[in-house]
Structure formats: C-alpha cells, structure tokens
C-alpha cells in the first residue's frame, strides 16, 4: 500500500491545470454503449476509477483505442453479452461505483443487464433506489439473485413514462436518461439532477441523435429514438479539483493561477470560498488566487455564524465540503459545515483535531470549525485517507502543517486525482510517494 510523505510549510507558486471531470467522464464512457458507432472522448483524466472502467469496457468487448494523451475512442459494436453474466465481470462491478451506470445503456440497447452491488467511497449510504425505480418505470423487470448477490434487469423494449424522482440523484438521473433515449415514446423526468455533468451528457446524447429538451433544468423531456450514432465529446475541467487548488493556495498562503477552469460551470464554488475570506479573481477562463497572510470568515447579516452547506445543483457540491472544512481551520472566525447529503464524510475530523485543529463534531452531518487565523500551525501527523475527498483535504492540511506528515491508503486519492504529487511538486510542494 503506497503512502505520501509531505514536508509541510512550503508555498506554491505558478500555474496549474485541472484534469477532466471524473464525475462526468464515468457517465460519458458508459453512454458509449448506446451505439455501435465510434465515440471519441477528449480530456479523460488518468485516474484509477476511470482507468478501471475503461479496462472493464475492453473486457466487455468494446474496442477501445488511446488516440492521444487524454483522448480515447470507444466502439461498442461487438459487446460480449455472455461475459456480462460471468463472475469476473460482476466482481469488477462490485469494486467500481461508476459501474451502476452501465444498467441504463445495457437495458436500453441489449434488453438485459446484470450488476452486483457497486463499490466506491465509504461515505455513508448511497441508495440505488432512484436508479432502479426509474428504470422500472420505463418497463424493465428487476430480480435480485440472493445466492449470487446480483441484480438482473431485463426488458423487451423500454416504454417512455412520466416520473417524479424522490431525490435529484446525479447518477440516478444519468442512468434513467441513458435508458430513456432508446425507449419507445416520451419520458419526462421531474426533479432531475441538473449538474454540469448531466448537461454535458445530455448534449453529447443529442449530438448522437437523441431528442432531449429541458437541459440545465430539473425537468427533462426525452423523445425516444430507434438508434444513436457516433460523435466526439470533450470533458469539462474538474470543478472539485479547481476548488481543491483554491483551498491549497489559501492554506499555504500561496499565489497561483488555475488555468482553463470553465468558470461558467463552477456555479457558487468561487462565492463559497469568498465567504471564507479567500480572495480570488476571474481572469478570462482562469482563476487567480493571490497570496494571503490571513483570511476572515464572513458572518450573516444578523451576525450569526456562517454556515456552509451542500445542496443539489445549483447548490454547493458535497465533494468540496471536506476541503472547505480544512481551509476553515486556519481562517479568522468560525463556521458551521453542514454535510446534508452523506452522513459519514465528516468522520475524518478526528485526524485534523490530532493535528491541532479546533473542530467540534456536532453529529454525523455537522461540524463547527474555530479558525486559528494562521496563528497556530497544524502539526505534521501520520494519517490515513478514508475516501477520495477526505484524502485531498488531509493532503492540503499536511501541506500547510509544521513538520512532516505521512498519508497512507493514497489509492483513495489516486481514484480521483491524476498524478497529484507530480503536479503539485511542479509548483513548489514537497510530496514523495513511497
């Protein structure tokens, strides 16, 4: 098991480019199964979760070719349906959460999908009900094989339907959407997720011949078509990585420029960091973060403590709350971090407390952070990364700490961040992989 050794206290300086968005590319790769024609995807990040899904596609019989440093082509002309029933395939699915989004394309195009309970982060309960109920509403049958621990989903031809989702699930909406584009008739999805990832998926599917309207809203209408064709698609920059770099700059008192961020797709992320007192400027499609010796958390107009909470888009993505919590440990003032959507993502705060942070964990969803105003540095420590987002938050803490820190289980970080130590070392960090 690999680890990072981080020498804290070094300022960063220079330019850094965000990778392609992990949450988008997992959906896009699954969507290539909807056509027998070639689909070319640009700006694919070289990270563990994505590479595992690409390898899974190869094993399914999809022709995958690496066309450039971050460009792949996919041609699902001869999918091996027998392999999809093998224990090897099902075992791989169980270790990759993104595999759940294979259900919609497989059922829509081939009439059948088998999948085991998918893996991924251990950040609390992530229900699959939205996926299953939505695809059932399109006419699919679900059967759970208790002896093998797998779900079998079958359908002769999916039928369009109206559905009101009980939660604005990003992956659930994507799965239903990918199934509905080849269904007979019209499908209406109300309370659909509308994150930029979903907007990108919708636009790609429309270029492939789908008929989707209501893009960027929570009401999607899909008129089913007989078949889709090939296309080209470019993945957006990863907004989570952009936010992570803003947090790193603040914690290490650094001046950096984050290049080509697709600013219009960042939503309220920049404003959320400004509420913590962090200065940043939009320069074209870049974000410039000046060096700040201190930053002060804002208060609400009535003087009450600032609250930073996640919410479905256009609210703040839950994937950045771990970073914002760490950033607040060195701010002037206090903030309540409210993680509404998952109940275990704050369970890494004990590690920050061991490093000297002042944090009160109120319950599994809420933590109050009392900032040090950079008056007391965090201390280097031996740490373990429990999930992707906590892992990057701990890395930020270690980079700002006094002394040396070690982070183990960095495979979790590798799942979501491409060559993170190489890119950060290039702008002044001191991180060694051992």
From Swiss-Prot:
CDD domains: UdpNAET (cd01555). Its EC number is 2.5.1.7. The keyword Transmembrane helix does not apply. Signal peptide: none annotated. Keywords: Cell cycle, Cell division, Cell shape, Cell wall biogenesis/degradation, Cytoplasm, Peptidoglycan synthesis, Transferase. The active site is at residue 121. SUPFAM superfamilies: EPT/RTPC-like. Disulfide bonds: none annotated. It is an enzyme of class 2 (transferase). UDP-N-acetyl-alpha-D-glucosamine binds at residues 97, 319, 341. Pathway: Cell wall biogenesis; peptidoglycan biosynthesis. GO terms for cellular component: cytoplasm. Pfam families: EPSP_synthase. GO terms for biological process: cell division; cell wall organization; peptidoglycan biosynthetic process; regulation of cell shape; UDP-N-acetylgalactosamine biosynthetic process. One of its GO terms (molecular function) is UDP-N-acetylglucosamine 1-carboxyvinyltransferase activity. Belongs to the EPSP synthase family. MurA subfamily. This is UDP-N-acetylglucosamine 1-carboxyvinyltransferase.
């Amino acid at each position: 098991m690999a680890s990072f050794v981080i020498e804290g206290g070094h300022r960063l300086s220079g330019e850094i480019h965000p990778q392609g968005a992990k949450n988008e590319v997992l959906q896009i790769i699954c969507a290539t199964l909807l056509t027998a024609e070639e689909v070319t995807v640009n700006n694919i990040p070289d990270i563990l979760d994505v590479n595992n899904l690409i390898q899974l596609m190869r094993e399914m019989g999809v022709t995958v070719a690496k066309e450039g440093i971050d460009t792949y082509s996919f041609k699902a002309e001869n999918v091996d349906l027998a392999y999809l029933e093998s224990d090897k395939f099902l075992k791989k699915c169980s270790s990759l959460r993104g595999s759940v989004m294979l259900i919609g394309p497989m059922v829509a195009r081939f009439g059948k999908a088998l999948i085991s309970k998918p893996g991924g982060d251990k950040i609390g309960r992530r229900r699959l009900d939205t996926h299953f109920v939505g695809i059932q509403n399109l006419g699919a049958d679900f059967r759970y094989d208790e002896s093998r621990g797998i779900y079998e989903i079958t359908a002769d031809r999916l039928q369009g339907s109206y559905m009101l989702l009980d939660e604005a699930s990003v992956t659930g909406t994507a799965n239903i959407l990918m199934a509905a584009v080849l269904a007979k008739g019209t499908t209406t999805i109300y309370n659909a997720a509308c994150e930029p990832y979903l907007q990108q998926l919708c636009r790609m599917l429309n270029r492939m011949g789908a008929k989707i309207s209501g893009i960027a809203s929570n009401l999607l209408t899909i008129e089913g078509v007989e078949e889709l064709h090939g296309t080209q698609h470019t993945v957006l920059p990863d907004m989570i990585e952009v936010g992570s770099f803003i947090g790193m700059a603040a914690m290490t008192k650094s001046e950096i420029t984050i290049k080509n961020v697709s600013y219009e797709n960042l939503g309220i992320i920049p404003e959320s960091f400004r509420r913590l007192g962090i200065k940043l400027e939009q320069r074209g499609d870049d974000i410039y973060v000046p060096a700040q010796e201190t930053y002060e958390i804002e208060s609400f107009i009535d003087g009450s403590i600032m609250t930073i909470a996640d919410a479905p888009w256009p609210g703040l993505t839950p994937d950045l709350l771990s970073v914002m919590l760490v950033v607040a440990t060195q701010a002037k003032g206090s903030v309540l971090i409210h993680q509404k959507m998952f109940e275990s993502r704050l369970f890494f705060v004990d590690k920050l407390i061991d490093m000297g942070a002042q944090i009160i964990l109120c319950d599994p969803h809420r933590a109050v952070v009392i900032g040090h105003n950079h008056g007391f540095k965090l201390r280097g420590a031996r740490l373990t990364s429990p999930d992707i987002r906590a892992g990057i938050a701990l890395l930020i803490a270690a980079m700002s700490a006094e002394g040396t820190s070690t982070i183990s289980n960095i495979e979790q970080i590798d799942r979501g961040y491409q060559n993170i130590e190489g890119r950060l070392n290039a702008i002044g960090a001191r991180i060694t992989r051992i």
